[in-house]
A protein has these predicted regions:
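Short, charged, intrinsically disordered terminal tails
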Residues: 2-10, 79-97
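Hydrophobic beta-strand residues in large extracellular and virion-surface proteins
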Residues: 22-24, 40-44, 70-73
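Negatively charged, low-complexity tracts enriched in Asp/Glu with abundant Ser/Thr
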Residues: 1-28
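A short, charged, amphipathic alpha-helix used as a generic interaction element across diverse proteins
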Residues: 61-78
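Short aromatic-glycine-(Arg/Gly/Cys) micro-motifs in beta-strand/loop hairpins
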Residues: 31-54
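Mixed-charge, low-complexity intrinsically disordered regions enriched for alternating acidic
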Residues: 23, 35-40, 61-66
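A short, exposed loop/beta-hairpin motif centered on an aromatic-Gly-Thr core
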Residues: 50-64
């Protein structure tokens, strides 16, 4: 199994009552087929807006690490330890957990 066609998706309930959708998977590009991409991104959406999209150091085959990243982000956002911003999340995306 890989992240190609199988992104990791989590939902965080933010302290202010909003929900954040967390996705760790292959970057979505309408011009390039999923199988031709290997860039794994961390994407956080709050409401209908994109709060952060960050390239990670992960490969498509690192499903367990992607799941761990999504869980860490979910838990951090839910607790208020992390803000749903690129600045707050990029340190997690830059490491293999």
């Amino acid at each position: 199994m890989s992240l190609h066609g199988n992104p990791i998706v989590e939902t965080a309930h933010l302290p202010d009552g909003r929900n954040a959708r967390i996705r760790v998977g292959i970057a979505e590009d309408s011009y390039v087929a999923d199988r031709d991409l290997n860039t794994v991104v961390l994407e956080v959406r709050v409401g209908h807006g994109v709060a952060a999209v960050i390239d990670t150091v992960l490969d498509a085959d690192q499903v367990d690490a992607a799941r761990h990243l999504a869980t860490r982000v979910r838990d951090g956002l839910s607790s208020g330890e992390l803000e749903p911003t690129t600045h707050a999340l990029e340190r997690l995306a830059d490491s293999v957990l």
